[in-house]
Structures are given as structure tokens and as C-alpha cells.
Amino acid sequence: MKEDSPPTVCVTGAAGFIGSWLVMRLLERGYIVRATVRNPGDMKKVKHLLELPKAETNLTLWKADLTQEGSFDEAIEGCHGVFHVATPMDFESKDPENEIIKPTIEGILSIIRSCAKAKTVKKLVYTSSAGTVNVQETQLPVYDESHWSDLDFIYSKKMTAWMYFVSKTLAEKAAMEAAKENNIDFVSIIPPLVVGPFINPTFPPSLITALSLINGAESHYSIIKQGQYVHLDDLCECHIFLYENPEAKGRYICSKQDATIHQLARMIKQKWPEYHVPTQFAGIDEELPTVSFSSKKLIDMGFKFKYDLEDMFKGAIDSCKEKGFLPYSTNEVKKGLFESSINGNVHGQKGNQKIGDEGVKLVN
């Protein structure tokens, strides 16, 4: 998408893990960025955006809320493109239908209506989730964009994060139809577990899972049992790549590498021996096969991944150490951020409650 003047784009959930890195990369390329956050006046949550290179001239903050119809109208008006990153997340919700599922679906539909009103938006890029693809009773060896999670299975089992899987699946399907009806080019990007360095001030929820072998979050082992991973920077570059490619439409898996929990444990043990990671896992077969997410469609478009699994974890661990979010050795882990965040003692957060994609509170 070549423009005579720098194109203007809107990024939702801009203060979070994915959103803030995406804003940084867009600014570097000369884009005029309208970043939506729930409270632009809360400097603790937006300072890292305002301090980015080119922010003074190319970045503006806009107040918007997924739960309020028309909330994004002003931010989107006049934009060439929209990157919808924000999503409600609250795995402990007592009313997931009304607090998670409906707001997620209505949020993306409201944004599409805002895009239609603007009449200038050429493409909407939506950050979906691996949870829309492979949540089913039996795992396949390889997944691609044609696969969808089994909603009946999810509702019957109601496993951890079930409402998130349902909300993202239904939202993506609804968005595809609504974008088509409104003649808006729609791209959905399906990332697996996102790992890497970060600039947002809070501890990214996805890293609680990714670093669970270090921080002792055993309840997250089921997620990394047969995991797939992508570097945060590769994911954000993918967003821009598909936005700028006029041929890009539909779903795109953005996954660089897969690994079983055993393979991940061996890598961490070798590269970061200061952390005592477990080597055996009750109920998990040592010969566990990997489950792959195929990025063939994306790669065939010309996209190139830059980072491998070791790069991802080095970036994440280094950032966590620098920000004081991760102890420097196993002996300090129980005093670290993970335990504090679960107890609600860090940045006013309470565990994973009401944290957006990734790290923005979206629901009161």
C-alpha cells in the first residue's frame, strides 16, 4: 500500500505486549499512528508509547473501549488501515458469556462498523489466536488455516481459558462476514504463543505461560505440552507485511517453531543453567510428538522469519531480568514477579484477570 504521504493507521490495544511493539515498528517505517487505549491520561500505562522514536510527531493517543459502541469512530476516521490487537481476557470470569465472549465479538463488529463509517479504511488486520485452530479432543500432526477449533468440545470440557477460545473463534468468523459485507479487506493473523523482548511496563501474560518451566506455573504446562512459538518481532513484522501486501486476504498462521515441553525444558536447562527446570512431567509421555502450525501460506507470500526458539526466550528472559520481573536464579524465583502478580501485588494486577492482548486492562 504505497501512499504519496505517510499513511495513517489505527492500532487498538496499543499499550500492551503486542500492540506497543507493533506501534514501535510502524513508527519506524514512517506511519502516522493513532493508538487507542482505555485511559490516555494514565502515564504509567502509556509512557512507554510516548517515549518511542518519532512518537512526538507521528503518534497520537485516543481513548476507546471495546465495550462501548462507536468508541473507535473518531480514532479510525481518516485512517487507511486498522490493526485490531485488543481483546478481553479474564480466565476467572464468573460470567464469561457477558464479560468475555460477547464483548470480544461485539468489539470487532463495532470496529468494522467504525471502519465502514470512515470510508477511508482499506484493510483491517486482526490479531486472532491459535485457540481458534486446534482446540479439539485429538491433536493433529499439522494444522493450517483451514482448521477451526471444536466449539462443542470446548463447551463440554470448559478447560482453562475456554471462554477465550470460544470468543476468539466466534469473533473471527463474525468479522470475516461483516468485513465482506462492508467491502473491507480483512486479514486475520493466527499466532501461537508469542515470546520475545517487550517494551510495555507490565509482565505480559503470555510470558507467564512461556516461562512456566522457570516460574513454576505448573497449571500452564498443558499449554506448552505440545507448543508452537513465534517471536514478538516476527509477529509484528508479519502484521505490517500483510497490511502492505495488496494480495493478502483471509487467515494466516504466523508460527516459527514447535517444541514439546521436554524439548523446551532441555533448551532452557542448557542455555540458562541458573534456572532449575524440571526434566520429568507426570502424565506426559517422554516420546510426545510435536504438533505443528504450518506457516506455508505466509511464507509463500514472501514473508521471512528472523528468530528461532532460542532467540525468543533470550529476548523474553533478558527483558524480564532488566525490568525486575524475573529473578536471576531459581533460588529467587519464589520471590519473583510471577508469585507477586498472582497475589495481586504487582502494578495493581490480580493474576491474569482482565488483561488485554497483551497486558492492557479492557474490562472493568
UniProtKB/Swiss-Prot annotation:
Keyword NADP: yes
Signal sequence residues: none
A Pfam family hit: Epimerase
MF (Gene Ontology): dihydrokaempferol 4-reductase activity; flavanone 4-reductase activity
Keyword terms: Flavonoid biosynthesis, NADP, Oxidoreductase
InterPro entries named among the record's database cross-references: Epimerase_deHydtase (IPR001509), NAD(P)-bd_dom_sf (IPR036291), NAD(P)_dehydrat-like (IPR050425)
Binding-site residues, NADP(+): K45, Y164
Statement: the UniProt record of this protein carries the keyword Oxidoreductase: yes
BP term (GO), one: anthocyanin-containing compound biosynthetic process
Catalytic function, reaction form: a (2R,3S,4S)-leucoanthocyanidin + NADP(+) = a (2R,3R)-dihydroflavonol + NADPH + H(+); (2S)-flavan-4-ol + NADP(+) = (2S)-flavanone + NADPH + H(+)
Pathway: Pigment biosynthesis; anthocyanin biosynthesis
EC number: 1.1.1.219, 1.1.1.234
Biological role stated in the UniProt entry: Bifunctional enzyme involved in flavonoid metabolism.
Family: Belongs to the NAD(P)-dependent epimerase/dehydratase family. Dihydroflavonol-4-reductase subfamily.
Name recorded for this polypeptide: Dihydroflavonol 4-reductase
